[in-house]
Amino acid sequence: MEKVSLARGTRDFGPAQMAKRSFIIDTIKKVFQQYGFQPLETPAMENLSTLQGKYGEEGDQLLFKILNSGDFLKNVNKKNIEEGNWKMVTGDIAEKGLRYDLTVPFARYVVMNRHEITFPFKRYQIQPVWRADRPQKGRYREFYQCDADVVGTNSLMCEAEIILMIKDAFNKLGILDYTIKVNHRGVLSGLAGLLSAAEKETSLFVAIDKLDKIGEQKVKEELIERGFDAASLPQLFEVLNFTGSTQNKINFLSSKFSNSEIGKKGLNDLNEVLNLLKNFGATDEHVELDLTLARGLSYYTGCIFEVKINRASVGSVSGGGRYDNLTAVFDSKEKSSGVGFSFGIDRLYDAMEELSLFPKETISTSKILIVHLDKESFHYSLKAAQTIRLNGIACEVYPDQTKIKKQMEYADKKNIPFVVVIGSEEIKTNLFTLKKMETGEQSKLTIEQIIKSIK
């Protein structure tokens, strides 16, 4: 017999896992929809010309390519094979690839449909993506992304709504101890201005992003190695080490950025987002200005977000930011400003599992199992089951005529909370035994009474 196995970097999700994943996805979907976001789906495969060149050289190497159908070697230039020019060979044998993320397909969709789309366009998208990465703990070749974006507006109300959506989703998922870290591209540029090193912004951001991983001393050493003036570093770390509320940090930075227009613009944007939260009737609870947050600097141009669940061992479970050039990758003349963020479904799942946050009711699929004692009661069970289902209660009938013990074990293993026992005596009296599996408590009821008691 051939040994069967999964492809490396992929996973199966059994019924119990799928119930939990569906709980997360359905909860997030409802939150997106409450804020006016509409669903979008794009194909699993895209033309390689759409995907290549959008993720840098390293990203291009992680694209899963799809062999052309039929005689895929027909158009291959043999000279390229002889010379080991595999990039050219790949172009000859593969014209399509699996999507690497949801952002590039979204940008392609916006460009192709810009005359039909109503802007500002609010979309959410929950689909799997594929990366030819080296599999390791927490890193898979197939995983789900869960994105929400608003494109076609500069309004900072969108940033405030992102914070509200994260709060609403976490509240509904039962996640209460978390931090929404925020920063701004302009604030980061203002920090570079403190060191008179605007031309070395990227080097500065890469270094300070490591602060919580390698510590202050190592970051200082790295900055000096990168050519920063050691005498100016105390001023930088005075700012980075300042503690207090988000509002206090903004006030403190205002005095430091008196000569930085871009820094002041960043602070004003953050201040406006906080004010908009108040206008929504919310607070800045869980929101923290983190000056070391420097994600996505190649494309984020305004506010930046990252979310961590404080007692979980997983890393960030959500992140995003403001961008000004979503569609520029396809049309340099077309620049669509927008803001978006993403939930990591797999990391959210791992964190909720670790912290035992899943409600018990997410596990079972059926509320009732009907157990039958003979052929007559089996046939009666079918009608009873349909009556129960038509009243909105998930119900199943054990499909085989077998011992009651085996039927009860089935209910126990599937975590079905109630069992209804039907035999010839029950059919005569129209009273059926309803057993609560958790406690063993039993009562004699009509089908109508059973429906009423469980609803």
Model feature map: region roles:
Residues 44-96:
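Polyanion/phosphate-binding surface patch
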Residues 61-73, 197-218, 309-310:
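Acidic, His- and aromatic-enriched active-site or binding-groove loops in soluble protein domains
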Residues 192-196:
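Short His/Asp/Glu-rich catalytic/ion-coordination signatures at enzyme active sites or charged loops
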Residues 1-21, 75-77, 82-96, 198:
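Auxiliary tRNA-acceptor-end handling modules of aminoacyl-tRNA synthetases
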Residues 179-181:
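Cytochrome P450
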Residues 38-44:
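A short beta-strand-loop structural module common to alpha/beta enzyme folds
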Residues 20-35, 46-47, 81-93, 101-176, ...:
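Positively charged, Gly/Ser-enriched RNA/tRNA-binding surfaces
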